[in-house]
Amino acid sequence: RIGARKGYTAVSTNNSNLGTSRGVEALHESLDRSGDKVVFSGGNNKIFSGTALTDITPVGYTISANNWKIVDFNDHTYFFQRGHEPLLYTDHSGSGVLEAMSSHSHATGTPPQGNEVLAAFGRLWVADVTGNKHTVYWSDTLNGHAWTGGTTGSLDLTNVFPSGHDEIVALSAHNNFLVIFCKRSIIIYTGATSPANMTLHDT
């Protein structure tokens, strides 16, 4: 059943931070281990927290769009967007910090600057990178900021696409399957808990 409601109620209390932009274009609610809730939003080429729209954009970090895909994984919050170095939010010290992944003390390797990210099967999965829309990348086990060594890896789907060239647009996990949505096809892998051994299930 589809319903519609008239009007809207403003939640943010500091809309001046959005300037004359299109407003909030990305929104994500995060819940940490302590049960604390943080609402992240992206707009006006900035990243905000809370309804007061507190600007938490890392100093010196340049944002050119607000198409963030935001996921929670292992008590961290990750921000991905094509053409941007991924961002990482942690609250281990009791004071939340948003930083470029390369600035994080435990980060390793170079993460893909993908437009799609999925937290599933004990790791992060990323796809839709500028110049490469046919490869899925994955992080190390239980470590979304480790992109070299360990069980990190990637999968080139060039020879898997069932109807010629295609482009990955979204990733999902369902019934223990890794589902890869492309513009012209859907590709399903089984055994994604061990990516090095996962096999093609269906296209």
Residue spans of the language-model regions?
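Recognizes the extracellular SEMA beta-propeller fold with strongest preference
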Residues: R1-T203
